Swiss-Prot record:
One of its GO terms (biological process) is ornithine catabolic process. It comes from Yersinia pseudotuberculosis serotype O:1b (strain IP 31758). GO terms for molecular function: identical protein binding; pyridoxal phosphate binding; succinylornithine transaminase activity. Its EC number is 2.6.1.81. This is Succinylornithine transaminase. Its cofactor is pyridoxal 5'-phosphate. Pathway: Amino-acid degradation; L-arginine degradation via AST pathway; L-glutamate and succinate from L-arginine: step 3/5. It catalyses: N(2)-succinyl-L-ornithine + 2-oxoglutarate = N-succinyl-L-glutamate 5-semialdehyde + L-glutamate.
Amino acid sequence: MEQPSPVTRQSFDEWIVPTYAPADFIVVRGEGSTLWDQQGKSYIDFAGGIAVNALGHGHPAVRAALIEQADKVWHLGNGYTNEPVLRLAKQLIDATFAEKVFFCNSGAEANEAALKLARKYALDNFANKAGQQGEKNQIVAFRNAFHGRTLFTVSAGGQPKYSQDFAPLPGGIHHGIFNDLASAEQLITDQTCAVIVEPIQGEGGVLPADKEFLHGLRALCDRHNALLIFDEIQTGVGRTGELYAYMHYGVSPDVLTSAKALGGGFPIGAMLTTTKYASALSVGSHGTTFGGNPLACAVAGTVLSLINQPTLLAGVKARHQWFIDELAEINARHNVFAEIRGRGLLIGCVLNAQYAGKSKEIVQAAAQYGLIALIAGPDVVRFAPSLIISPKEIKEGLARLAMGIEQVCQKVTS
């Protein structure tokens, strides 16, 4: 077999559309929560592919599931169903409030499906009906949210920097203030078909919703016959210490979207809902070529089986505390964080005023010492590691973070 051509980081700049600015090294191998680059340098992975690699890299059971299915059938298309997709659907239904599942390839697709479902349900059940004043097609979302990059979902996300260059944007979307129920109450009316919210705003700064806020949204949606959609793309599949974050709050959505960790690194997305709302969609009303792909569903079924275990979920909560304790010690030495927040293994370290705007600089400095981490805006350093990362890897990774922080501190104070 012909040897592949050598590639470098410069190859990215020459050949790839410049929608990303990746690190200056190329990862070639991963095992557990450790990665290696082309030069053999090792990195502790606190990013997890942005909350995707929930079981780390190269988990033997996940790899075995992929290989086993690859020996059977890879793809069929939606004219035929397959065993892995049916088994995965049943797993999700048994584990959540849902009764029906729509499979797709990504979080953006899952959110797109959820928003289309909401408008279709409202059209079928309320448009031109007695007592309905005006059309019922308005969507309420929240500032600093992130719901994907399609034109519809990027419009729902309340971050103009991602949408302002693509006008005209889809209409009928209104943005309230996250965790401000009075703000939401002003926007949610009988013309509202859906409210979409993240239980924890991930890209928006790792900001958890207040329990009262989500319960209030539930009540407002019930009052105005609007669907409550929980975007659990980042918080789902064990990330917060429950299978889905809504389980922390004691409030169930009408629709839930899931992706990222669901495939453990293999692309897959899902929209979960009840029979009542799923009935709004009929054959041909929505679809996606690769949705329910046998390879993706076989992998996701194994990932879900491994994660949806009491011991593993309890371990996520324990690891959260390990992180918090070590981060508090780092902050006692360097005084860079104003707040450490999040749930489970979705953690955000908010920089104080002296270090405002330096999250990317800290992450880049930490990478020099062998740590891969994330940002959530200019003022938040974010961690979303494997749910089974070892205590040793946590301690070593945070030691490398501390070295990166010290490097930035020296620049700031010199």
